[in-house]
């Protein structure tokens, strides 16, 4: 036992090469050469058979044989690099005096460049028995010198011999095995080894099996030939001896990619992670050829066409010793992670062929967690194993790998169905079949870290929904001595349960959002959005300190309007019965003479009244939140109604409010609603307020004219001017700001005392549609315009991205004034606004010469918004133009989005916009921002182009000129090539017509956006309207001329090809009810099949004749016959990607369709004249 490295029961001996990275031992081995020669370490494992056991030597074969071509199939590229590994074998087993080297050439496909040992990447074959030697046990250490070996250290290149690298595996079946507990300590690394014994009933004479025994002094030293593995793609890579690697050497098989990986050594500094726990051990075949199978993720895994041998997947107890291999792709945490799962174990090749009689499926564990679904106990029995436990000396060499194999193997008579543990939830997960020898387990090195703690008898906490992992189940099944399992050790080693559902890849997985997007263009009528854009409600917890009502205190009889001893709130619905008001928007009308009793409850049953005056808990869906901010809703004096006037206007009334909060900035918290009783205007009712001694008392006066105006007079002892004059901070109190427009008061109105507080009026946020709403929002107020034109003549209209629009009444004529949102200080900003003003002066200004104006009118100037004047004030620029009462085309389309506009109006819209563009282009100008929001509608329904903010004069001389309009309507050449031509406006107009005709929402990005700019209009559907059906829809009595047979059919066809439309339009299908007599069905012929073809054809022809008789004779042909598709063809030309392929405005206006519509129409573009237009003049 002392001299033989390994001895079985029969007495046969064989040497097992072991790794030795000790520099001291290296000097002993390489003393003759005076250089450090690293020795490669391997385990030559033998199997014990019950009947007879004999050792088979691993014979060497030349790599240049047909077998190599069988494996590689000549499919590997020559760019794959060769890894040259050399093994030194000592002939003398006692003193390790002699050393022989075996050079092995192995190709590695990935272009790795690694400077250290690849975590015991033992991708080399096992040595023959004749070349092996043993080393003293004391020489084996765990130290690994990074500089102990190099390619240049080999002095005898002739001693290097090639060894076989590829062979066929024939795995053996072992049905039962036992587990002997083992200890893995970091101090002395004492390992208890287990023996695997095969059942006598299943002998296989083809190969013998031996028990693995590693004696105390039976360690051979094999060092790696090179620590610097040059794996870069270099065709000139040379071997150690200086020779070039032959091109035909490609010793990697596609069928050998997936094999259990178990490193032999983890002593390298690079290998921070431990080797795998489980290593598959497969018996050698008759040829005893050394084999390895390297997992790889880049090499194609398709089966070799010339493969004739069948491979069985190695089981956890019958895998080949050659399976103790590591791929360069499986590096530690400090290694190279060139792939997504570079730190994971090997994947299983799909090219592996299983034996038909023993079908197996490989189940692997990836990562650091293992999920075991259930344990299975086979029906057959197993023979007890003959245990052989030997204690090698203290070392942490490759012996620990065997310990990991034996100590963590599954227990006997149990099989675990292990899931493929992938990180990504998108990968397939397949369960393995129940077979005792079909498990190949790959695990990371962290399992070994806590391996010594897995035999504890203490219960290990696991999630109740997760079963035990394989290694834990095995150790729990045992009853052995070991260290105590601690939670910290378990957490440091590896997660002991499958926690993939809690991993980031599962927690943050989201569906592909584009899958929920529309596959095409969205119809406007398919979007159901609320018509009113409401403001968010106020925070309910923000209470006004001055408006809190105390319902527990009795109101003193300060006013005759209150009953004595009554609570302020009275009944829940009686709060306003105490408030005499002239003009209040309450849920029910309140009689000022009504007393406080329960009879008034029914007057306020429509809403729940808040106990806090100034807030409303109920919101009306038909009005905005602004209208519901308070029940104390006061209208302007112009909206007073006689029935709402108080019967006793001369009587002073007081309403009591209690507030327990001192009106002091140091006490009252800083809330947005803090200053609620600040100056404002326009109230026509009195709201008397009573407060305690700490809070101010608000009194109310009556003007001399007898009309009650709410005025707040605070007690001068408790209130100060500073508290009232401070500006508010929320929209509710914006009307109380300093800039509120109020008439100046004279001294008589203020009172004789100059220190008295001015009586002010209160207005609680009038609605946006009220005439005086300008005074509510400071952003909608312009002091300069008010001073210039008067407050009554200025009205806020709306705002855009860069400007605010006002309506101005000047000399009894309305104008529109556009003001910049912000003061323009920068040079570029001023140039932009000046360029717009210049364009307006050139294009739309009214000339002094009347003849010139008339000529320009005929050329299309009338379809542009007229320019009046422009000026600046305090860096704000004002542009005064013509006012269009009809709003914008965008608003018009929104109002009519629920049905399709008739084609005649579409042609009218196209003609009017083209006339305006023709005039713009004739002046060598480009609009570049044409969209419905910039097209205005006059009172007569005509269209006018406005907003020349991006208008540019041609030619463009600026090198860095870059102007882009709305991305929904922008032409593609403006983005890609910066080509500014008049055809860019034609493209924008084509998209406007497409939007109107198809009733769609133009996309602003994505695939539909790109398709529209590539000439693909397939998503839009048909653009030409079915004017016949629309004509019949708007003429409900015309169906009386239809025969009864046609009406009984319930559906029919117009007879024209495509004249009935298709399902892509909203106006092609109308239900027909023979009983109602006011509607008609015009369905496509496909939907009209209800009987025999002859009957349907007869009914369709009769219906077609009757319908054609209803069409007026003067109707344009292109509107009657739906197969003409004139509008579709025109839009396709306008939206061509090449700008020079598009027609000009003049060319489109010269089309016959445009000429016919222009001659027939009598109204503006937005006025409906019928599906076929107005009849011609007699």
Curated annotation (Swiss-Prot):
InterPro entries: CC_SR_Kinase, Kinase-like_dom_sf, Prot_kinase_dom, Protein_kinase_ATP_BS, Ser/Thr_kinase_AS. Disulfide bonds: none annotated. Mg(2+) binds at residues 934, 947. The keyword Disulfide bond does not apply. Residues 37-55 have a biased composition (Basic residues). One of its GO terms (molecular function) is metal ion binding. Residues 1-61, 188-209, 288-336, 378-434, 451-473, 524-543, 584-606, 721-754, 1034-1068 are annotated as: Disordered. It catalyses: L-seryl-[protein] + ATP = O-phospho-L-seryl-[protein] + ADP + H(+); L-threonyl-[protein] + ATP = O-phospho-L-threonyl-[protein] + ADP + H(+). It holds the Pfam family Pkinase. Phosphorylated. It is found in: Bud neck; Nucleus. It is an enzyme of class 2 (transferase). Its main location: other. Keywords: ATP-binding, Kinase, Magnesium, Metal-binding, Nucleotide-binding, Nucleus, Phosphoprotein, Serine/threonine-protein kinase, Transferase. The keyword DNA damage does not apply. Residues 1047-1061 have a biased composition (Gly residues). Residues 1-35, 299-308 have a biased composition (Polar residues). Protein kinase that acts as a negative regulator of entry into mitosis (G2 to M transition) by phosphorylating and inhibiting the mitosis-promoting cyclin B-bound CDC28 at 'Tyr-18'. SWE1-mediated inhibition of CDC28 acts in a cell size or morphogenesis checkpoint to delay mitosis in response to defects in growth, actin organization or bud formation. Plays an important role in filamentous growth. This is Mitosis inhibitor protein kinase SWE1. It comes from Candida albicans (strain SC5314 / ATCC MYA-2876) (Yeast). The lineage of its organism: Eukaryota, Fungi, Dikarya, Ascomycota, Saccharomycotina. The gene is SWE1.
């Amino acid at each position: 036992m002392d001299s033989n490295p390994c001895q079985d029961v029969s007495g046969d001996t064989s040497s097992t090469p072991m790794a030795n990275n000790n520099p001291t031992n290296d000097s002993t081995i390489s003393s003759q050469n005076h250089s450090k020669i690293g020795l490669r370490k391997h385990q030559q494992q033998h199997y014990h058979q019950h009947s007879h056991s004999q050792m088979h030597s691993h014979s060497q074969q030349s790599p240049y044989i047909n077998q190599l071509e069988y494996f590689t199939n000549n499919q590997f590229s020559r760019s794959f690099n060769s890894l040259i590994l050399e093994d030194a074998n000592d002939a003398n087993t006692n003193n390790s005096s002699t050393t022989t080297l075996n050079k092995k050439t192995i190709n590695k496909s990935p272009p790795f460049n690694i400077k250290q040992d690849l975590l015991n990447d033992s991708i080399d074959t096992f040595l023959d028995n004749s070349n092996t030697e043993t080393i003293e046990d004391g020489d084996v250490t765990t130290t690994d010198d990074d500089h102990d070996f190099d390619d240049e250290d080999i002095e005898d290149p002739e001693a290097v011999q090639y060894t076989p690298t590829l062979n066929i595996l024939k795995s053996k079946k072992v049905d039962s095995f036992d587990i002997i507990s083992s200890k893995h300590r970091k101090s002395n690394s004492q390992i208890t080894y287990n023996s695997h014994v095969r059942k006598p009933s299943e002998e296989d004479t083809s190969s013998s099996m031996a028990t693995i025994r590693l004696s105390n002094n039976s360690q051979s030293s094999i060092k790696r030939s090179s620590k610097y593995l040059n794996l870069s793609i270099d065709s000139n890579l040379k071997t150690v001896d200086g020779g070039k690697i032959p091109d035909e050497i490609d010793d990697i098989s596609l069928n050998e990619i997936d094999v259990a990986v178990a490193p032999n050594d983890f002593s390298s500094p690079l290998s921070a992670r431990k080797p795998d726990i489980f290593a598959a051990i497969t018996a050698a075949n008759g040829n005893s050829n050394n084999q390895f199978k390297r997992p790889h993720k880049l090499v194609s895994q398709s089966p070799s066409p010339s493969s004739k041998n069948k491979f069985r997947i190695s089981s956890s107890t019958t895998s080949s010793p050659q399976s103790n291999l590591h791929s360069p792709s499986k590096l530690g945490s400090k290694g190279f992670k060139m792939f997504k799962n570079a730190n994971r174990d090997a994947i299983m090749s799909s090219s592996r062929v299983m034996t038909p009689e023993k079908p197996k499926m490989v189940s692997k564990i990836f990562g650091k967690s293992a999920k075991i679904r259930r344990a299975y106990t086979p029906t057959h029995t197993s023979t007890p194993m003959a245990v052989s436990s030997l204690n090698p000396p203290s070392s942490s060499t490759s012996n620990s790998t065997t310990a990991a194999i034996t100590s963590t193997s599954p227990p006997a008579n149990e099989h675990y169905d292990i899931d493929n543990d992938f990180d990504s939830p998108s990968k397939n997960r397949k369960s393995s079949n129940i077979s005792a020898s079909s498990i190949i387990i790959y695990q990371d090195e962290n399992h070994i870290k806590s391996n010594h703690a897995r035999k504890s008898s203490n219960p290990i906490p696991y999630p109740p929904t997760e079963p035990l992992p394989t290694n834990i189940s095995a150790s729990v099944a045992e009853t052995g001595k070991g260290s105590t399992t601690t939670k910290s050790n378990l957490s440091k080693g590896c997660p002991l349960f499958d926690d993939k559902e809690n991993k980031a890849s599962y927690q943050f997985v989201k569906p592909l959002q584009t899958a929920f997007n529309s596959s095409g263009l969205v119809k406007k009528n398919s979007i159901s959005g609320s018509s009113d854009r409401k403001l968010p409600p106020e925070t309910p917890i923000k209470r006004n300190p001055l408006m809190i009502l105390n319902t527990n205190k009795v109101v003193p009889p300060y006013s005759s309007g209150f009953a004595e001893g009554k609570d302020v709130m009275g009944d829940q619905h009686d709060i306003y019965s105490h408030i005499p008001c002239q003009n209040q928007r309450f849920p029910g009308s309140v009689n000022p003479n009504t007393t406080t009793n329960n009879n008034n409850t029914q007057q306020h049953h429509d809403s729940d009244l808040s106990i806090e005056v100034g807030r409303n808990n109920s919101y009306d869906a038909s009005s905005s939140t602004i209208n519901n901010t308070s029940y104390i809703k006061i209208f302007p004096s112009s909206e007073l109604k006689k029935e709402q006037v108080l019967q006793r206007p001369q009587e002073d009334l007081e309403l009591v409010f209690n507030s327990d909060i001192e009106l002091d900035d140091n006490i009252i918290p800083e809330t947005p609603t803090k200053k609620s009783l600040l100056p404002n205007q326009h109230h026509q009712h009195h709201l008397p307020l009573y407060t305690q001694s700490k809070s101010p008392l608000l009194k109310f006066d009556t003007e001399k004219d007898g009309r009650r105006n709410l005025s707040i007079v605070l007690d001068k002892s408790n209130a100060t001017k500073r508290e009232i004059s401070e500006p508010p901070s929320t929209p509710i109190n914006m009307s109380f700001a300093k800039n509120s427009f109020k008439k100046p008061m004279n001294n008589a109105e203020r009172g004789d005392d100059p220190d008295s507080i001015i009586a002010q009026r209160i207005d609680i946020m009038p609605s946006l549609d009220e005439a005086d709403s300008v005074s509510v929002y400071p952003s909608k107020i312009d002091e300069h315009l008010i001073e210039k034109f008067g407050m009554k003549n200025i009205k806020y209209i709306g705002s855009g991205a860069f400007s605010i629009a006002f309506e101005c009444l000047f000399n009894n004529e309305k104008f529109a004034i556009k003001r910049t949102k912000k003061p323009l200080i920068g040079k570029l900003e001023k140039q932009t606004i000046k360029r717009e003003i210049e364009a307006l002066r050139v294009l739309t200004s009214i000339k002094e010469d009347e003849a010139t104006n008339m000529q320009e009118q005929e050329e299309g100037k009338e379809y542009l918004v007229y320019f009046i004047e422009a000026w600046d004030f305090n860096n704000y620029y004002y542009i005064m133009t013509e006012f269009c009462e009809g709003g914008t085309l965008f608003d018009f389309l929104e109002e009519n989005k629920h049905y399709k506009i008739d084609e005649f109006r579409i042609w009218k819209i196209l003609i009017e916009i083209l006339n305006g563009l023709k005039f713009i282009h004739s002046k060598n100008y480009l609009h570049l921002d044409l969209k419905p929001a910039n097209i205005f509608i006059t009172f007569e329904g005509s269209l006018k182009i406005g907003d020349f903010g991006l208008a540019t004069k041609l030619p463009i001389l600026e090198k860095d000129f870059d102007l882009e309009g709305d991305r929904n309507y922008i032409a593609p050449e403006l983005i890609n090539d910066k080509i500014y031509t008049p055809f860019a406006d034609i493209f924008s107009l084509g998209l406007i017509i497409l939007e109107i005709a198809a009733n769609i929402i133009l996309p602003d990005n994505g695939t539909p956006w790109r398709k529209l700019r590539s000439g693909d209009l397939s998503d839009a559907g048909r653009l030409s309207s079915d004017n016949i059906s629309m004509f019949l829809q708007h003429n409900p009595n015309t169906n009386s001329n239809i025969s009864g047979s046609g009406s009984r059919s319930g559906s029919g066809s117009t007879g024209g090809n495509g004249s009935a439309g298709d399902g892509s339009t909203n106006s092609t299908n109308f239900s027909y009810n023979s009983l109602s007599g006011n509607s008609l069905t015009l369905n496509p012929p496909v939907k009209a099949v209800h009987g025999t073809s002859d009957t349907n054809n007869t009914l369709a022809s009769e219906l077609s004749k009757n319908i054609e008789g209803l069409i007026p004779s003067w109707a344009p042909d292109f509107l009657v016959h739906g197969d003409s598709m004139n509008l579709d063809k025109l839009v396709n030309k306008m939206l061509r990607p090449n700008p020079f392929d598009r027609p000009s405005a003049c060319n489109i206006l010269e089309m016959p369709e445009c000429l016919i519509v222009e001659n027939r129409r009598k109204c503006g573009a937005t006025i409906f004249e019928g599906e076929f237009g107005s009849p011609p003049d007699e």
